[in-house]
Amino acid sequence: MKMRSPLLIAAVATLGLGAFVARAEAKKPAAPAAASNGFQTDFLGLLDDVQKKILSLEDAIPQDKFKWRPSPGVRSVSEAFLHIAYGNYGFTKGATGKAPPADVGWGTDHAKWDAKTTDKAEIKKTLEASFDQVRAAMKDVQDADLDKKVNVFGHDMTERAVWMALLGHLNEHMGQEVAYARANNVVPPWSMPKGG
């Protein structure tokens, strides 16, 4: 009969003991999940990214292009930026039930809102205030409430879906503004070659 190496025996015993412990651990009841703000963290990270891009694009497009529109009946540069802010307030109201501050003049007539100014500085302030409103509202969001049903713009959906739709709306209209910028020979700042 051959003698087994003590090292081999020790390795096999260790593996066997490890498997036994792993099975025992797997049978233990799971610890209660810690309070999480995972959605909030993810959402705010995505919001920061799209906000920086939108504001940098608004900065890059010259004031004399803010009345430009690709064709009659389509939003102009200024109207599209204001529409972004309108959506920020509208989706936030839909998710939280809280109306935007009275002094912003938000209402149900988005065409009137979109056409309220073509002044670049005013539009930037409006955009920044709308992003601040979204961010402040998101800080109160709890993961446990995200499946709560709400009605937004006549549609029943979860609170989570409203926040996701807000991000979708931001990206849709950022893309619109990118097309407008490029049609006017403005390169989106984040697309410029590095170092020059």
Residue ranges of each PLM-predicted region?
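Bacterial N-terminal signal peptides that target proteins for export
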Residues: 1-10
